[in-house]
Amino acid sequence: MKQYQYSPLAPNRQIRLLKLCAGTEAEKLSGELVHVFLDEKPSFTALSYAWGDSQPRKAFCCSNLKMEIGLSLHSALRNLRQPTCDTLLWAGALCINQHDISERSQQVRMMSDIYAAAFATVIWLGEESSDVKMAFGW
């Protein structure tokens, strides 16, 4: 499978959103990155999470092309995926071309606007553990 290549964003407040394909827990994660203009007020959920270590990485199928994402993002997407309908998400590690310094700088400057425009923001703390249960068991 060929490696995913980012296509450039328009300079006027365009962002990428991940259209995460519906699926069961047994199915591999897949989706596509779509370009939208923030000023057109698309309905999406923003994802905030700790990126964690850059290695190891997990496979992600983006527009039928290969992409690798961090374990924390993979875990978050697996838990946010719906069984019967696609989900529109923004996650910086995936929706911003991290290898394009100019784009990354421009998109980081827009992050407060992106989070403000989101229908909801999900904060991913990681997989459930006994420590998490204890923290929320007050």
Feature map (PLM): residue ranges:
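Metal-dependent phosphate/diphosphate-handling catalytic cores characterized by acidic Asp/Glu clusters
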Residues: M1-W90, I96-Q106, E127-W138
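PIN/NYN-family metal-dependent endoribonuclease catalytic core
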Residues: W124
